[in-house]
Amino acid sequence: MSVSTSSKNTLLSSIISGILSLVIFATLRFCADWFNGSQLNVLVGGYLFSWLFILSLTCVSNAEMLIFGPDFQAKLVPEILFCLSLTVAAAGIVHRVCATTSVLFSLVGLYFLNRISIKYYSTSVVPVDAPARKTAKKFK
């Protein structure tokens, strides 16, 4: 049984994004007191938690691609809402306002990820002109 290169890349990407999301959560949890310092610190925390969302979504999506096949795509209801609620809960542990700003930054990041994926992975259909039908001559 041989494993294809794309399967290896998907597995490696899933592992790396999972480890990085755990490292980000542990670091932000460890530095939770720093977020009480100023409003700018809270915004930075929300931005960093949005990276936690993106990395956890990458981990979950790549794991599902390994299980269900390479054509599987993450949908809004199960994957995106699960990762977003997980991120909001983790950010709420650190600071309540971090949870709110992380939702906003995560939605902006999700918008740009969607634009990038449409640009690189969508198949564009070339329109084919249908031959013109011959119409009967109209007599006046």
From Swiss-Prot:
<feature type="transmembrane region" description="Helical">
    <location>
        <begin position="98"/>
        <end position="118"/>
    </location>
</feature>
<protein>
    <recommendedName>
        <fullName>Protein KRTCAP2 homolog</fullName>
    </recommendedName>
</protein>
<dbReference type="GO" id="GO:0016020">
    <property type="term" value="C:membrane"/>
</dbReference>
<keyword id="KW-0812">Transmembrane</keyword>
<keyword id="KW-0472">Membrane</keyword>
<keyword id="KW-1133">Transmembrane helix</keyword>
<dbReference type="InterPro" id="IPR018614">
    <property type="entry name" value="KRTCAP2"/>
</dbReference>
<feature type="transmembrane region" description="Helical">
    <location>
        <begin position="11"/>
        <end position="31"/>
    </location>
</feature>
<comment type="function">
    <text>Subunit of the oligosaccharyl transferase (OST) complex that catalyzes the initial transfer of a defined glycan (Glc(3)Man(9)GlcNAc(2) in eukaryotes) from the lipid carrier dolichol-pyrophosphate to an asparagine residue within an Asn-X-Ser/Thr consensus motif in nascent polypeptide chains, the first step in protein N-glycosylation. N-glycosylation occurs cotranslationally and the complex associates with the Sec61 complex at the channel-forming translocon complex that mediates protein translocation across the endoplasmic reticulum (ER). All subunits are required for a maximal enzyme activity.</text>
</comment>
<feature type="transmembrane region" description="Helical">
    <location>
        <begin position="74"/>
        <end position="94"/>
    </location>
</feature>
<feature type="transmembrane region" description="Helical">
    <location>
        <begin position="40"/>
        <end position="60"/>
    </location>
</feature>
<comment type="subunit">
    <text>Component of the oligosaccharyltransferase (OST) complex.</text>
</comment>
<dbReference type="Pfam" id="PF09775">
    <property type="entry name" value="Keratin_assoc"/>
</dbReference>
<comment type="similarity">
    <text>Belongs to the KRTCAP2 family.</text>
</comment>
